Amino acid sequence: MPYTPLAATLALLIPTPGQAQAQPPSLQDQFNTATAAWERHDCAAALPLFDALGRDPRIKPGSLPAAAIAVRRGDCLLRLGQSEAGEIAILSGLPILRTAGDTFTPEVAQAEVALGKLAIARWDHDTALAHLETARDLLKGDERASVLMLIAMLTAFDGGTKGLDAAAEGLKIAEAAPKPDKKQLVQWHTARGRILLNQGLAKEGRTALTKALDLAGGLTAHASLTDAVMRADLAQAAMLNRDTEGAYQYMAASGAGRVGSSPFAKAAAMNPPLCGPDTGLEPADTAVVEFSIADDGKVDSAQPVYANGSYAKATAFARAVSHWQWRPEDAAKIPLFFRVASRVELHCTQATGEGGASPVLPLQDRLDRWAFPLIAPYHPAIARITGWPQWLAIAEAAQKAGDTKAEIVARTYLAPLDLRAPTTALASIDHALTLATSPDTLPPEASNATRILLTSTRTATLRRQERRESSPTEQEKRADPALLALADDALIAQDPLAQDTAVLLGLAARPRSAEAAEAQAHLARVATDARLPDHHPIRQFAQLRLANDAARDGRLAEAQTWFAATGLTQEQCALIGPKPALTGVNNGASAFPWDIMRWGFEGWVRTEYDIKADGHITGIHAVIAYPPFIFSKPAQEMMTTARYQSSFRPEGGAACSANQTTVNFKIPDNQNTVKIVQKKS
């Protein structure tokens, strides 16, 4: 968009002859220099000059020069990544520029578009649309095209005609060019196709997308990133038209699911959005979200492509994806082609945790109450800490300040979130353990809690290094000697909550037969620990495990006694009880459908379901799937064969609600994968 001529502004800045001695002659030069740098997008040079002009007492607040300086300064702040400050600056000057006449119209339109994009980035639909429509109405001819595309994509989930009208006008502009640009025509047909799909017009949407594909050269053996995205759109359209074979063909041609090792399943943080009033999502809602992964493993862009609901629902799914994260070393293994744009199918989850409560929560809560005031000087908004980099920064700041207590606490909270290399993460844990074990460093209860939490995370980190994903049941049979030894520590033994937590964390979820009696004895001591209240969550956790074990052995009267001791209803047990261990599932070659295998697809599905008291599962559905819609049904069919340990429930209710398991579909020595070809420079 062309910049605004500055004649109207400059006339207000040039001093009159009678003022020549009062005003430095460099003011006009500063303005000209700043504007010239802004025109050529050299904001590193322009911003300091605009800052100086904004502070200059000769620039009258509320004047047109002040407004122009504020808007251009704000534009530079946006370009330099300072979104909040940039938005404030633009909003402070824009009202005056809006009334300054036609000379400033292009600049006002540019500012409106910038504000619209900021609103889109924070999922503010109505504010974004208001700014974009204002910009559109200020522009004429082909200058409207880029704004029309933004409006079309923003309103794709709204229903009505706004999105389709914007796409139709954009297409008309592109077709009216003396030499129509095929790339632009492809973009407009694609936009129209997506909008139609999201309005439930699958047949019409597929027709528009097919037109885009034809203009782009058809289905070939090679695919650019643009081609891959277009083919994924057509796969979506074919699936919505119940053309499964066509969907497989287009999805295969996009390269999705044919990367070789299905790397996206290895995310360190990957949660679907919750169902319920906070998100507005219901179990029947679904979406496909396209996202990109930065070098540090964070998602730096996430946008909904398809949803069967409104903009609010579509973006609720995209917001969830925006918080996903991969370890940097895992992200580096994903080919750049797929890191730039990949898609997943999403449904909301009814799980608020990982299925079954962890016995660590009461100890964690106790530590939080003591520790959070120590952290406040380093990060007052603790609730807004969302990842390991912030905890690491707090730990390092506390270490630099010689604040050992705060450093130990920060490293304790850092440990389970740490996405650095395992050796680095373990070094941080060991350093914190050394500090926490030193006499008189922490109050006894805080020392006990940090030592137990750090030791538990240390074991989990070491086990991740063992790469034993192929036999998850094996790890469920292994106790943690380090935690069981901590339970016998003289200081921890005087702290019932800490000691019992260490025992429960240290016991195997599914002990080997030779260790079962010892595990039962440990559980009984925790279940009957009179140092804790009768219905303390730690005692309830142990009592439920004992009830389950007794029921599996046919000791139903004993199981009833332990269950009654919890004081819980069976519905409460399904939410907070220990998660049953998986005992078997048919995950052999027969579970991989041939009609999918022959295309060379590999992928994964995170399934969610309830585990019944008899170990069978019910209510199976997919919550995340890659590639979209390919493996969702096979994963659900496979999980119907899963069996878990039985659990005691007097009325046979659920043993564990909203449990989640990831099902991987892999082809050994798969030769039907895509090859990434680097463009010659």
Regions found by a protein language model. Give the residues of each.
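Gram-negative bacterial Sec-dependent N-terminal signal peptides
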Residues: 1-19
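Charge-biased low-complexity segments
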Residues: 21-157, 161-165, 169-681
